[in-house]
């Protein structure tokens, strides 16, 4: 199983980018989120993302999804839930360009699982990113914050 990407909007611009965690940051973190009935978007995160989007930042979701590797839900169930998140954000005025996710279990030792930088490297191969002007937003300093530190980027923690 490889790092997986879902690209919603392609562009050729070099843009500052917000790399944002999904579960616990954009939406309520439920155990291995994959049911649309469980989807609850955090208004404060929407406001933060709209702020950066208004300043010309691209929005890209980066998320660990070990529930796939553990067999708790399928790739199709993940995609359906993630599309629900992205569509809800779009309804609220936030355009997500792509989602990059690691489907592996933590014990698999892959290079894409956050706080490793594999997901970001994939995004950098698909998009022109002003990495020096970019940042990471997430709810966990040990994962999202460490990802930011590994990249030398600022980190904005959100808590709900």
Swiss-Prot record:
It catalyses: D-glycero-D-manno-heptose 1,7-bisphosphate + H2O = D-glycero-D-manno-heptose 1-phosphate + phosphate. Gene3D superfamilies: HAD superfamily/HAD-like. It is found in: Cytoplasm. Its cofactor is Mg(2+); Zn(2+). One of its GO terms (cellular component) is cytoplasm. Belongs to the GmhB family. This is Probable D-glycero-D-manno-heptose-1,7-bisphosphate 7-phosphatase. It comes from Thermoplasma acidophilum (strain ATCC 25905 / DSM 1728 / JCM 9062 / NBRC 15155 / AMRC-C165). The lineage of its organism: Archaea, Methanobacteriati, Thermoplasmatota, Thermoplasmata, Thermoplasmatales. The gene is gmhB.
């Amino acid at each position: 199983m490889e790092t997986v990407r879902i690209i919603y909007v392609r562009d050729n611009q070099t843009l500052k980018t917000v790399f944002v965690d999904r579960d616990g940051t954009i939406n309520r973190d439920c155990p291995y989120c994959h049911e649309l009935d469980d989807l609850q978007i955090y208004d404060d995160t929407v406001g933060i993302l709209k702020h950066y989007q208004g300043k010309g930042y691209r929005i890209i979701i980066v998320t660990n999804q070990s529930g796939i590797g553990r067999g708790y839900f399928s790739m199709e169930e993940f995609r359906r839930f993630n599309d629900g998140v992205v569509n809800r954000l779009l309804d609220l005025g936030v355009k997500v360009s792509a989602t990059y996710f690691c489907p592996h279990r933590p014990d698999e030792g892959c290079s894409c699982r956050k706080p490793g930088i594999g997901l970001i490297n994939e995004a950098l191969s698909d998009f022109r990113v002003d990495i020096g002007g970019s940042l990471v937003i997430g709810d966990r300093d040990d994962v999202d914050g460490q990802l930011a530190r590994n990249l030398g980027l600022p980190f904005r923690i959100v808590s709900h």
